[in-house]
């Protein structure tokens, strides 16, 4: 009994422990089963254990590969992940990663291609690498990519795992906002090797599907790819920031009306890198891209006109020397008291490159072209009109621009963009402007003859001004026609379209040259005519002044030889500046001819009169010389000066003079000539414009000097008790000999025939129309020093002659106003 009870107790405890163990094992199996993927049905314990074992084996293999490929911690910063470190390395090396199949299809490209070449990754994916290369390099690059297939049809794992890198150089096409621009290539370097990958998606519609034959291709599922790092041969110092997704980042700033920074938001430093104190006081145009300055200037003008607006997308230079795309909403704030514009408030938003490209192409009225048209080497046009900022950069590639094949050219973005700066130069040649012009200019070129009028002979009064040189914008609009390049797949059709464009430009240039040559010939003929008229006027002036001494000798036999010599010197001094002067205006020529004719006619008339009219002739000739020497470019109305000298001399006066003085003595003529030879100095030409129009009427008034002038004693004057001596005043406006001061000198010897009141002598000089505002200068005529004992003439008391002013030189008028004073 006791043994049986002991056995039952042991059996019960053993069963209890086994049950506990089985329950614990079932819990673990159930937990493993829940952790396995794809648990759609209930699995037994054996299946669960098999799957767990398989997962552990895979995990061990992956861990081993990760340890091999993982970057060692000794040279990689611990706070950077592998992806971040790879991106930083690519940016520092000016490179990107690309994966290309053996037939040239691009299956992967990193995002760093955008700041380097301007392509979006989505545009490059599933395209063929040969589409981005010049035609001269297609065969060479294709041989490099298919080189491993020539060695063996099925690459061995040892060949694929070899560390021998493959390096080669080529040119890669640059991306641009405008696909119509002439293609530009960048010189790059490929460094990489071949790797095998499974389940690589086959590209579709890349244009090179039939390049390789089916037997030469690697079987599906065992694709071999060329993985390489692409670097620029010429490093870029200014790169475009790669922002593919819209980050919705913005910041505010405040500017003056001249667009200088006055305030910067705290959100700006993480975006542009500048602290507020680094940009305050600087102009916003210092941070903008050179290609966006013209568009931003237009936006600034629009803002100043309307007070608010939105700018276009533009590039802003960050502190890290990268271009970031921004778009600004701005408005002008006004002072609350005087309502004057105070400053400009701007809200800047970050824009992605993809959005900018879509917006620019919409502005250009272009549809998003397919891959063949986007990366084609030929210029293709959809027939839409191009805006002025579209340029044909044909001159940048030289003579190879006419060829459809793309010649390799190592040009960076900075050198490529600097070629557009010639548009802002006003002195650019038409050849350079041809590359920068806008195409819609045929209507302006058709009206070219109307825009260049040739002045006729009716405008001979004024010299024809030289033709104004047209600005760069007008010249380019006249030169370039509106040419539409039809998109043709054949290279010869593309060549013919380009050739027709250059032929049209050549015809426009030849037409412009013919018009300019005709204008030059017309101007030369007009200049020749003016020179002939100048020679005629100068010859007449020489004859006039050579005849003047002979006229004076015919009436004054007592004139001394030294007076004749002084008169000849004076005439030579007047003639020499006129002969040495430059070309004059036609208005001056005509006035000088009329002046010389009137002077010759007056001298011939005066030669038939008595001694007293001789003095009037000398007075008129002196004033005529002064009037002719004061001819200025401002007016041609001085031709009316000599005919307006109305001198009235009665016959009775000349008879009295002949009876009372049988042997006349005209020694006082010399003193009168000396006084009249003083220069009449008007104001400088610059002061003519400074006068108000209301002062013009005052210049013609008569100015009287009541105390400072001496009395002019006329030999034929009536007695002092019933007459007054006339007072001569010579003005630039009007000069009138009028009786205004009584004479107290007795004249008992005056004959009775001369007691009649002689008519007053009026010397009237009309002021020129263009010299109304000149200063009126008066000549103070001293009294005659009459010889004592002369019959019939009163003897005035000896008066001290007024000192003569030294002649002054007026640079703005003729040099004849500065004649030397003859010796006393």
From Swiss-Prot:
Q: Where is the PAS domain?
A: 82-152, 237-307
Indicate, by first and last residue, each region the UniProt record lists as having compositional bias (Low complexity). Answer: 559-576, 614-636, 739-760, 809-824
Q: Where is the composition biased (Basic and acidic residues)?
A: 1-10, 378-390
Subcellular location(s): the record lists: Nucleus
Q: Entry's SUPFAM superfamilies?
A: HLH, helix-loop-helix DNA-binding domain, PYP-like sensor domain (PAS domain)
Q: Key word Secreted present in the record? A: no
Q: Pfam families in the record, alphabetically?
A: HLH (PF00010), PAS (PF00989), PAS_11 (PF14598)
- Annotated Polar residues bias: 421-431, 587-610, 645-664, 694-704, 766-789
Task: Tell me if Metal-binding is a UniProt keyword of this record.
Answer: yes
* Quaternary structure and partners: Component of the circadian clock oscillator which includes the CRY proteins, CLOCK or NPAS2, BMAL1 or BMAL2, CSNK1D and/or CSNK1E, TIMELESS and the PER proteins. Efficient DNA binding requires dimerization with another bHLH protein. Forms a heterodimer with BMAL1 and this heterodimerization is required for E-box-dependent transactivation. Interacts with NCOA3, KAT2B, CREBBP and EP300.
Q: Function, please?
A: Transcriptional activator which forms a core component of the circadian clock. The circadian clock, an internal time-keeping system, regulates various physiological processes through the generation of approximately 24 hour circadian rhythms in gene expression, which are translated into rhythms in metabolism and behavior. It is derived from the Latin roots 'circa' (about) and 'diem' (day) and acts as an important regulator of a wide array of physiological functions including metabolism, sleep, body temperature, blood pressure, endocrine, immune, cardiovascular, and renal function.
Q: What is this protein called?
A: Neuronal PAS domain-containing protein 2
Gene name of the record? NPAS2
């Amino acid at each position: 009994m006791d043994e049986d009870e002991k056995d039952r107790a042991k059996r019960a405890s053993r069963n209890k422990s086994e049950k506990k163990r089985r329950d614990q094992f079932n819990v673990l199996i159930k937990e493993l089963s829940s952790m396995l993927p794809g648990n759609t049905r209930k699995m037994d314990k054996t299946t669960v254990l098999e799957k767990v074992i398989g997962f552990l084996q895979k995990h061990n293999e992956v861990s081993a590969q990760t340890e091999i490929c993982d970057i060692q911690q000794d040279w990689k910063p611990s706070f950077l992940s592998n992806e971040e470190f790879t991106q930083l390395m690519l940016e520092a090396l000016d490179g990107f990663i690309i994966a290309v199949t053996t037939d040239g299809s691009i299956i992967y490209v990193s995002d760093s291609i955008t700041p380097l070449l301007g392509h979006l990754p989505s545009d490059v994916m599933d395209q063929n690498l040969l589409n981005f290369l010049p035609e001269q390099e297609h065969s060479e690059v294709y041989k490099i990519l298919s080189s491993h297939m020539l060695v063996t049809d099925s690459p061995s794992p040892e060949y694929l795992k070899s560390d021998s890198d493959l390096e080669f150089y080529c040119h890669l096409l640059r991306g641009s906002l405008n696909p119509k621009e002439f293609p530009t290539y960048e010189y790059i370097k490929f460094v990489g090797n071949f790797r095998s990958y499974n389940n690589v998606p086959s590209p579709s519609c890349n244009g090179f599907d039939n390049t390789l034959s089916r037997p030469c291709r690697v079987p599906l599922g065992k694709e071999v790819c060329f993985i390489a790092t692409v670097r620029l041969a010429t490093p870029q110092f200014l790169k475009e920031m790669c922002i593919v997704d819209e980050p919705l980042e913005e910041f505010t700033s405040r500017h003056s009306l001249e667009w200088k920074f006055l305030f910067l938001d705290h959100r700006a430093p993480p975006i542009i890198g500048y602290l507020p104190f680094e940009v305050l006081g600087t102009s916003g145009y210092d941070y903008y891209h050179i290609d966006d300055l013209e568009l931003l200037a237009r936006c600034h003008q629009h803002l100043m006109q309307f007070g608010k607006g939105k700018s276009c997308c533009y590039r802003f230079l960050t502190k890290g020397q990268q271009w970031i795309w921004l778009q600004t909403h701005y408005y002008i704030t006004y002072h609350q008291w005087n309502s004057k514009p105070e400053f400009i408030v701007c809200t800047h938003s970050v824009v992605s490159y993809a959005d900018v490209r879509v917006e620019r192409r919409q502005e250009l009225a272009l549809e998003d072209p397919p891959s063949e048209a986007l990366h084609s080497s030929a210029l293709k046009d959809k027939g839409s009109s191009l805006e002025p900022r579209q340029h044909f950069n044909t001159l940048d590639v030289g003579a190879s621009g006419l060829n459809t094949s793309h010649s390799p050219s190592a040009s960076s973005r900075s050198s490529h963009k600097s070629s557009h700066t010639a548009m802002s130069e006003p002195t650019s040649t038409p050849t350079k402007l041809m590359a920068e012009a806008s195409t819609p200019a045929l209507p302006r070129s058709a009206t070219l003859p109307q825009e260049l009028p040739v002045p006729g002979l009716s405008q001979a009064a004024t010299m024809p001004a030289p033709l104004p040189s047209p600005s760069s914008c007008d010249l380019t609009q006249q030169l370039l026609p509106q040419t539409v390049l039809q998109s043709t797949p054949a290279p010869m059709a593309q060549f013919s379209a380009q050739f027709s464009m250059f032929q049209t430009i050549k015809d426009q240039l030849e037409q412009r040259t013919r018009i300019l040559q005709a204008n030059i010939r017309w101007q030369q003929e007009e200049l020749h005519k003016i020179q002939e008229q100048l020679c005629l006027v100068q010859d007449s002036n020489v004859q006039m002044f050579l005849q003047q001494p002979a006229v004076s000798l015919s009436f004054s036999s007592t004139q001394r030889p030294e007076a004749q010599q002084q008169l000849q010197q004076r005439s030579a001094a007047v003639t020499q500046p006129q002969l040495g002067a430059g070309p004059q205006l036609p208005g001056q020529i005509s006035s000088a001819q009329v002046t010389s004719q009137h002077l010759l006619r007056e001298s011939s008339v005066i030669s038939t009169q008595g001694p007293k009219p001789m003095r009037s002739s000398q007075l008129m000739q002196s004033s005529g010389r002064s009037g002719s020497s004061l001819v200025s470019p401002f007016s041609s109305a001085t031709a009316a000066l000599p005919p307006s000298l109305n001198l009235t001399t009665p016959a009775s006066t000349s008879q009295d003079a002949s009876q009372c003085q049988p042997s006349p003595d005209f020694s006082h003529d010399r003193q009168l000539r000396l006084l009249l030879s003083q220069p009449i100095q008007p104001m400088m030409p610059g002061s003519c414009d400074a006068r108000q129009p209301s002062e013009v009427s005052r210049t013609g008034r008569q100015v009287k000097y009541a105390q400072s002038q001496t009395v002019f004693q006329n030999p034929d004057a009536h007695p002092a008790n019933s007459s007054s001596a006339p007072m001569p005043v010579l003005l630039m406006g009007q000069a009138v000999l009028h009786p205004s001061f009584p004479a107290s000198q007795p004249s008992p010897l005056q004959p009775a025939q001369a007691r009649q009141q002689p008519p007053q002598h009026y010397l009237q000089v009309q002021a020129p129309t263009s010299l109304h505002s000149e200063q009126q200068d008066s000549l103070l005529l001293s009294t005659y020093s009459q010889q004592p004992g002369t019959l019939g003439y009163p003897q005035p008391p000896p008066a001290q002659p007024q000192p003569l002013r030294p002649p002054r030189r007026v640079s703005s008028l003729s040099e004849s106003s500065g004649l030397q004073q003859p010796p006393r």
